[in-house]
């Protein structure tokens, strides 16, 4: 139950502070271990859409890290076709129980805004990003327009 108490507090903080890049947060009050929300990137080529993510917290949270899955398809070297993301802050070896969910979300937004081709989950996209940025951006922008969700209007 410690996980639920902490998650309730973290959710309250996030809602109170109003993160402009993480919106439309949905949490089932009966199950605080699953959150959904929209990532709203600032940087091209992802600034034309929003991306729904799901955050799954283990029952052992905060002693074990959450898992993040993209529910919206995204053309990104660090996010695979199944929506799994390579995010160092939530890897088992880097995870620290003091890390809060808003920090995890900020790291995720930073990664989406600024891909890390040196740690790819999709080598083909990492190569395209590194060798032909213009082509990558064109493909990613088209993909975002096709699959991305509507950005929330303030």
UniProtKB/Swiss-Prot annotation:
Keywords: Acetylation, ATP-binding, Cytoplasm, Nucleotide-binding, Nucleus, Transcription, Transcription regulation, Transferase, Ubl conjugation, Ubl conjugation pathway. GO terms for biological process: cell cycle phase transition; cell population proliferation; cellular response to glucocorticoid stimulus; cellular response to steroid hormone stimulus; protein K11-linked ubiquitination; protein polyubiquitination; protein ubiquitination; regulation of DNA-templated transcription. Residues 2-149 form the UBC core domain. The active site is at 86 (glycyl thioester intermediate). The modification N6-acetyllysine is found at residue 131. Gene3D superfamilies: Ubiquitin Conjugating Enzyme (3.10.110.10). Belongs to the ubiquitin-conjugating enzyme family. Interacts with PRKN; involved in ubiquitination and degradation of misfolded proteins. Interacts with UBE3A. Interacts with CCNB1IP1, CBL, ZAP70, RNF19A, RNF19B and RNF144B. Interacts with ARIH1. Interacts with ARIH2 (via RING-type 1). Interacts with NCOA1; they functionally interact to regulate progesterone receptor transcriptional activity. Interacts with NDFIP1 (via N-terminus); the interaction mediates recruitment of UBE2L3 to ITCH and causes MAP3K7 ubiquitination. This is Ubiquitin-conjugating enzyme E2 L3. It comes from Pongo abelii (Sumatran orangutan).
């Amino acid at each position: 139950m410690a996980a639920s108490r902490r998650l309730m507090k973290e959710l309250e903080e996030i809602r109170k502070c109003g993160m402009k890049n993480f919106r439309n947060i949905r949490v089932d009050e009966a199950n605080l271990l699953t959150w959904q929300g929209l990532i709203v990137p600032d940087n091209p080529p992802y600034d034309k859409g929003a991306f729904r993510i799901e955050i799954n917290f283990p029952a052992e949270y905060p002693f074990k890290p959450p898992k993040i899955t993209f529910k919206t398809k995204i053309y990104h070297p660090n996010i695979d076709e199944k929506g799994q993301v390579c995010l160092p802050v939530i890897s088992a070896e880097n995870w620290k129980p003091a890390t809060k969910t808003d920090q995890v979300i900020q790291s995720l937004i930073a990664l989406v805004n600024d891909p890390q081709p040196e740690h790819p989950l999709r080598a083909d996209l990492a190569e395209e990003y590194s060798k032909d940025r213009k082509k990558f951006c064109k493909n990613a922008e088209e993909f975002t327009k096709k699959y991305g969700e509507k950005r929330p209007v303030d």
